[in-house]
Structure formats: structure tokens, C-alpha cells
Curated annotation (Swiss-Prot):
A Pfam cross-reference name: MMR_HSR1
Stretch list, region G5: 150-152
PANTHER family listed in its UniProt record: GTPASE ERA, GTPASE ERA, MITOCHONDRIAL
Protein's UniProt keywords contain Phosphoprotein: no
Segments for region (G4): 121-124
Identification of the protein by name: GTPase Era
Annotated residues for binding of GTP: 12-19, 59-63, 121-124
UniProt-annotated stretches for the region G1: 12-19
Classification lineage: Bacteria, Bacillati, Bacillota, Clostridia, Eubacteriales
Subunit and partners: Monomer.
């Protein structure tokens, strides 16, 4: 059989486990995770390479009704991505009937010719009878090329996705080297890991208004990497929460982020964090550009 290579998009509404699925398939944490919706803001590409094929999996932001320019950017990224891939994995929760957001995504999928797999995540949380009922509900909405129940967290059903995907991936060369797991620059990964720790440690109101910019990423002669990063928030009160009493929260965020970045880069780092207030930055084209989000004006 000839070698195959292609692009696979993982889409779905916010917080259904898209980043968990990407991390499980690649066997490495390359996408940040939290239980808060809209954690993923950019497309993140994970690379899987074996003797038969190379698959480039694209984790997209959750499709939702946007309230800011950042939200509009996230939805546009997800919507445009599905037009440029060889296969789409539509990820839903196995224990939930199709909702308005799911139906909206399906309407978009029906307008393109790209094959779509229905992937039902969190199958370990539901009985077989209820699962079959939910599968039936989705089957009435669209003709999926494959329907695969999985548990991304427990690595259950993942091999079946890869096996079935081969039938829809074209012949082609390797786009990336065999040892490459993601095309994300190290600077971007570092910023995302810092943002993840903010998401995990703070209340719901603050994280949605937080962006992270790595302002310096330099390797020293002794092999240590110096990283300087700024955490942007929209309110002075949020700045105080992020820093915490006597700086304890910022220290906690920095310590957790440093551990994660060191594990990913396989080297020691020195991490410095600052917190700055930028009111309404999620609606600022200049700030979105600074943080790496492409808008219609850049």
C-alpha cells in the first residue's frame, strides 16, 4: 500500500474534549486543557507518524456565538479550517442529546463535501442503551461516514479512529519529520502553557479576559532558557486576583507553568511573569495582533 498523508480537523462546541483528544492521539500534551469553555483560541496541529501514514490533526476553537472580536476570530478559525482538510472529526459528548450548537455545526458540515466522522466522547459516563439513543438522534441529523464512541481521557477507541481515517486520507509524502509532534513554535507553546495555568487557578470571570505574550525567549550558554512573559487582563481588580496576596497566586501560576514548559522542552527554564491591564483588549485589533490572533485588519 502506498504511503498516505493528510489533514484531519477536530471540531465541536466548546468544552467537549477536543484538546484532550489531540493530546491523547499524539501521546504528548501539545494543547492546553481546562474545564472552561473556549480554552483553545488558535488552531493547534498535532502530528502522528507511522509506517502507513502521517496525519496532521488540527484542534480548533469551539464553535460558539461570539461576543467579542476575539470570539469572532475563534469562530472564523474553526469554520475556515473545515474547508481545508481531508477529514473532519465532529466531537460531541456521548451523554448529551444534540443541542442548538451541535445542530448549528452540523448545518455547516452539510454544506461542504469533506467526509465527517461522528466521535462520541466520554462514553464511559453513559449506559449502552442511552448511548444508542444519542447515536440515533445524531444519525437523523446527518449521514456520517463513521460513528465511533470513545473516551479521550482513558484512551479508549482512539485506535479505531486512526484505522477508519486511513480510508479517507489521500496518498502523499510526509510533511513533517518522524519525531515531530506539533508545528507550534516553542514560544507559542510556552505562552499557552502559562495561560492554561491561569485558567486552572482562577475563577470563571478572569480567565476569559486573559491573554499571554512571551516577550523574550532566549537560550543561555549554559543551556538554560530565559523566558519573559506578560499576562494581560482587562480590569485592575483582575490584576490583583492574578497576582494574589503577597504575589502568591502569580508564583503558583509561574511554578506550574515552568514545570509544564520544562517537561515539554526537556530542559530547565527561568520564567519571569508580569501582569498588565489592557481594558477591552479582546476587542482591540492591535492587541489581538500582538497576541498572535489574525483579524480581518492584519
Amino acid at each position: 500500500m502506498s504511503y498516505k498523508s493528510g489533514f484531519v480537523s477536530v471540531i465541536g462546541r466548546p468544552n467537549v474534549g477536543k484538546s484532550t483528544l489531540l493530546n491523547t492521539i499524539t501521546g504528548q500534551k501539545i494543547a492546553i486543557m481546562s474545564n472552561k469553555p473556549q480554552t483553545t483560541r488558535n488552531t493547534i496541529r498535532g502530528v502522528i507518524t507511522n509506517k502507513e501514514c502521517q496525519l496532521i490533526l488540527i484542534d480548533t476553537p469551539g464553535i460558539h456565538k461570539p461576543k467579542t472580536k476575539l470570539g469572532e476570530y475563534m469562530v472564523n478559525v474553526a469554520s475556515e479550517t473545515i474547508k481545508e482538510v481531508d477529514l473532519i472529526l465532529f466531537l460531541v459528548e456521548a451523554n448529551t442529546q444534540p443541542g442548538a450548537q451541535d445542530v448549528n455545526i452540523i448545518q455547516q458540515l452539510k454544506q461542504i463535501k469533506t467526509p465527517v466522522f461522528l466521535i462520541l466522547n466520554k462514553v464511559d459516563l453513559i449506559s449502552k442503551d442511552k448511548l444508542l439513543a444519542i447515536i440515533d438522534s445524531y444519525s437523523k441529523l446527518m449521514d456520517f461516514k463513521a460513528i465511533i464512541p470513545i473516551s479521550a481521557l482513558k484512551n479508549d477507541g482512539i485506535d479505531l479512529i486512526l484505522k477508519e481515517a486511513l480510508d479517507y486520507i489521500p496518498e502523499g509524502p510526509q510533511f513533517f519529520s518522524e519525531d515531530m509532534l506539533t508545528d507550534q513554535p516553542e514560544k507559542v507553546i510556552a505562552a499557552e502553557m502559562i495561560r492554561e495555568k491561569v485558567l486552572l487557578n482562577l475563577d470563571d470571570e478572569v480567565p476569559h479576559g486573559v491573554g499571554v505574550e512571551v516577550t523574550s525567549f532566549k537560550e543561555r550558554e549554559d543551556g538554560l532558557i530565559n523566558i519573559q512573559a506578560t499576562i494581560y487582563c482587562e480590569k485592575s481588580s483582575h490584576k490583583g486576583i492574578i497576582i494574589g496576596k503577597q504575589g502568591n497566586m502569580l508564583k503558583k501560576i509561574g511554578s506550574a507553568a515552568r514545570y509544564e514548559i520544562e517537561r515539554l522542552l526537556d530542559t530547565k527554564i527561568f520564567l519571569e511573569l508580569w501582569v498588565k491591564v489592557k481594558p477591552d483588549w479582546r476587542n482591540s485589533d492591535n492587541m489581538l495582533k500582538t497576541l498572535g490572533y489574525k483579524t480581518n485588519k492584519n
